[in-house]
From Swiss-Prot:
Induction: Transcribed by SigG at time T3 of sporulation. The keyword Signal applies. Residues 91-115 are annotated as: Disordered. InterPro entries: Spore_lipoprot_YhcN/YlaJ-like. The keyword S-adenosyl-L-methionine does not apply. GO terms for biological process: sporulation resulting in formation of a cellular spore. It is found in: Spore cortex. This is Sporulation cortex protein CoxA.
Amino acid sequence: MGKKMTIASLILMTAGLTACGANDNAMNDTRNNGNTRPIGYYTNENDADRQGDGIDHDGPVSELMEDQNDGNRNTTNVNNRDRVTADDRVPLATDGTYNNTNNRNMNRNAANNGYDNQENRRLAAKIANRVKQVKNVNDTQVMVSDDRVVIAVKSHREFTKSDRDNVVKAARNYANGRDVQVSTDKGLFRKLHKMNNR
């Protein structure tokens, strides 16, 4: 019995010490030190490192739960801010064409593609009104970004290439050199409708 215990403990110690010699001086090797992009599986990020904007892409539940009482600099406490927000003006439209949320992403836009730019909103309204006048167009939803105009069209008849060309021609007059894309996809129409009405 004593020999078995001695042999078992010797094997265990040998197996444990084997890993110590596998990568000599690995602590000083900085070629593979794990500096990967954070992917959001943790909640210990310090929002102050990102100028307090609260956008660290941890995920919805983590964003709700982290930093609950850290001096009003979190995403959940939007009524108690310590600085002026980026856009506290009256909403641009009250007819449901555009969203009325002025305080999206606290003070900065996490993905600033130009969609929430007021000039782009006005331009989208002009394009939507003009495209609605095109023959065979019953309804339209328009999204304008800094480099693109996306138009979703609803029609009760088959939408031909000629109809599409007429929509592009009508929109190009307002597009200011932006790429104009026209779609009859119902899913895109619903998505743009939700985007414009949030």
